[in-house]
Amino acid sequence: MGKKKLYILSFLLFWSVAIIAQNDYSVGQFYDQSLTKERKVLSREPVRGDDVIWEAKIWRMIDFRERFNQFFYYPYEKEGIEDRKNLVYTVWDAILNNEITVFEDDEFKIPIDNELIKKRYTKIDTLWLEIEDDEGTVDYQAVIVPKEFSSENIYQLVLKEVWYLDKEISAVSVQILGIAFVMQDLRADEDGEMELRGSVTLFWVPLMSENVKKLLANSFVYRDYNLANMPSWEEIFYTRYFNSFIIREDNIYNRYIKDYYEGTDALKEAERIESALFHFEIDLWEY
């Protein structure tokens, strides 16, 4: 009798543990993913202003259409992608939820009200409905249909970063200060065909903000070769896991490279700046 009670008790205990474990896991998963869902912001050694003896500000462009950078762009659909989000929707949803503040300028001095952001980038379509009354008279009524924000035409990302020499560690380091999404301005011509009218910088996201750091540290990047260990967006930027090209260095005229060079000359200027940054630290120790 005692053994029977012991078996029953063991069975009930096992069953209750199984039920609790099942409730902990998300539907569609076979193991607890809490370790990959809750991450702390990467710790960095603080930099003292007195230790910075040289610095240079650089603006560079990441093009999502480049094969290596396509994980920034996909998935550009917002619905039906499980928990996957591209970088644009990661930031956009945080704006909608009032979790972060974005700025008009790359100096991060002019904050944009989140409600204004929603109105600015939510498009409006006008549909005309044909209404016929009992007497056969036809009238037209306009119906305003809001069109949700879409990342489909956002193909580029601008980074603002600072390169600096820290005498405390005798090394050149780099810190990304902020990012900005660039959207293609597509409009219909007279024949109804969409044509590119230019590009628009949407807003600047301050990567030094604690709220933004927390957001990026807990938002994951989909890479199809290892779903069990997906990096966070914070890790992507920290390890500089992207291809990019320089579009501006800090200068007294506040000009971009495209303002004074075109074509191959612009490419050569970008390469010259990149090379100067790369060799700066090496040249310091040459005698």
Language-model features, listed with the residues they occupy:
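Bacterial Sec-dependent N-terminal signal peptides
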Residues: M1-V27
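A domain-level signal for the mature, folded cores of soluble proteins
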Residues: Q22-L165, L186, L207-Y287
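Extracytoplasmic
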Residues: E152-I154, V174-I176, V200
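A sequence/structural signal for flexible, mid-protein segments enriched
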Residues: Y164, I169-V172
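Extended serine/threonine-enriched, polar tracts that run as long, contiguous segments within proteins
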Residues: A171, I176-M194
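Short secondary-structure subsegments characteristic of cysteine-rich extracellular domains
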Residues: E195-V212
